């Protein structure tokens, strides 16, 4: 076990100039990519630290208008009512949801916001989960987050999408994520996969990493054509001695 690699990685060659680290480099690349165009879309996976990322983007880009995509969805109470059959009364077990993100979108609100964006002058920042439903804009950035990091944030008080369940049992939050929220988020990500211009890794607070969409797609294709494994996850709270699940 002493030779076990706890941090496996695969080196992807040919894209040294397609990777960016830190907000300074990322801001520079976004502005270069935007050029004289005006609509920046930052579509996000669920659980992103909006207070950090959105504030930085507003400060760096100084947009004339900021559109939050959460406004196209039904309110939190209605979302819960719509999800209830899949959530069940069980603490852990739910029913898998096979629908899409559009099932939870208020189409009237979406149409209104789409019209608003279309008629605005100056830089427009469209931000949040499902932002590309409003428009793919002139530059599409996808801000991603791993499920493991989301679960850690649930434990630290992160609520589910459009909810205020900050102090709820993390297992109940996980259930909502696993059986419904992550399912629609994954489908949505796949739908816009080929359209992503820049891919943003937000797993480490205030230490973002970004690569171009071309580098992102080619890297995934390369990895999928060879053996690979993920970083092992350790659940130290399960028993007195550390138990590692090598996923």
Locate each region found by the language model.
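Conserved small/polar residues in nucleotide/adenosyl-binding loops
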Residues: 236-243
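Structural motif
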Residues: 42-47, 127-129, 203
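Residue-level preference for the first positions of well-ordered beta-strands
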Residues: 37-41, 123-125
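Small-molecule kinase domains that catalyze NTP-dependent phosphoryl transfer to phosphate-bearing small molecules
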Residues: 2-3, 130-132, 156-219
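Glycine-rich P-loop/Walker A and Walker A-like loops and their local beta1-loop-alpha1 context
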Residues: 17-26, 40-57
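ATP-dependent NMP and nucleoside kinases share a basic, alpha-helical "lid"
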Residues: 116-159
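Glycine-rich phosphate/diphosphate-binding loops that line cofactor/substrate pockets in enzymes
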Residues: 26-38
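ATP-dependent small-molecule kinase phosphotransfer cores
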Residues: 2-21, 63-122
């Amino acid at each position: 076990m002493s030779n076990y690699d706890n941090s496996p990685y695969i080196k992807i060659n040919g894209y040294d100039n397609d990777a960016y680290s830190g907000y300074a480099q990322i801001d520079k690349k976004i502005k270069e990519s935007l050029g004289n165009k005006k609509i920046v879309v930052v579509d996000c996976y669920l659980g992103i630290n909006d207070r950090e990322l959105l504030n930085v983007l507003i400060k760096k880009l100084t947009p004339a208008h900021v559109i939050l995509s959460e406004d196209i969805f039904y309110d939190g109470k209605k979302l819960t009512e719509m999800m209830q059959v899949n959530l069940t009364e069980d603490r852990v077990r739910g029913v898998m949801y096979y629908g899409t993100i559009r099932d939870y979108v208020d189409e009237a609100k979406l149409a209104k916001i789409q019209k608003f964006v279309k008629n605005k002058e100056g830089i427009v920042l469209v931000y949040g989960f499902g932002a590309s439903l409003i428009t793919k804009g002139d530059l599409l950035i996808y801000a991603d987050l791993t499920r493991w990091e989301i679960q850690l944030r649930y434990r630290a008080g992160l609520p589910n999408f459009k909810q205020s369940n900050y102090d709820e049992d993390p297992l109940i939050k996980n259930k909502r994520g696993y059986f419904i929220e992550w399912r629609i988020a994954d489908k949505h990500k796949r739908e816009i996969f080929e359209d992503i211009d820049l891919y943003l890794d937000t797993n480490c607070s205030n230490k973002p990493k970004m690569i171009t969409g071309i580098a992102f797609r080619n890297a995934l294709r390369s990895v999928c054509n060879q053996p690979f494994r993920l970083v092992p996850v350790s659940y130290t709270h399960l028993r007195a001695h550390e138990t590692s699940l090598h996923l």
